[in-house]
């Protein structure tokens, strides 16, 4: 049973995958998207679901610090609903508050250059989201 983790932004979707036992999350890739043109990366996500035999997807839900859901959170909920309908899979939302900051701290502590951090931050945020979900089980 593999689980895909997604950090959905306005320009990219960070992707992480669990191991087969569902214990650890590894960064996979970052998919470029364009919301204005209706390009959400669903084709690539579908390919990854087939390639890795995924049976569940975890989508990060950005909440405000007071727990409310703003416009970005609503967009992520719609993204998740579209995935659920398209792929006929279990798609769950996971509170992603501070996941990007946690990913940034991990990369800084690993002495990753600013340029390289910018390239992998979304993928690492997806890892933080997915690992949080896996650890809760």
Curated annotation (Swiss-Prot):
- Looking at the keywords, is Hydrolase present? yes
Indicate the segments annotated as coiled coil, or none if absent. none
What biological-process GO terms show up in the record? rRNA 5'-end processing
This enzyme's EC code(s): 3.1.-.-
In its UniProt record, a GO molecular function of this protein is:
nuclease activity
User: Pfam families under this entry?
Assistant: RuvX
Indicate the principal place this protein occupies in or around the cell: cytoplasm
Which superkingdom heads the taxonomic lineage of this protein's source?
A: Bacteria
Report whether Transcription shows up as a keyword of the record. no
Cellular component terms per the entry's GO annotation: cytosol
Q: Which UniProt keywords apply?
A: Cytoplasm, Hydrolase, Nuclease, Ribosome biogenesis
Matches recorded under InterPro entries: RNaseH-like_sf, YqgF, YqgF/RNaseH-like_dom, YqgF/RNaseH-like_dom_sf
Q: Tell me the compartments it is located in.
A: Cytoplasm
| Protein function | Could be a nuclease involved in processing of the 5'-end of pre-16S rRNA.
Q: Which NCBIfam families does the UniProt record give?
A: RNAse_H_YqgF
Can you tell me which family this protein belongs to?
Answer: Belongs to the YqgF nuclease family.
UniProt-recorded name of the protein: Putative pre-16S rRNA nuclease
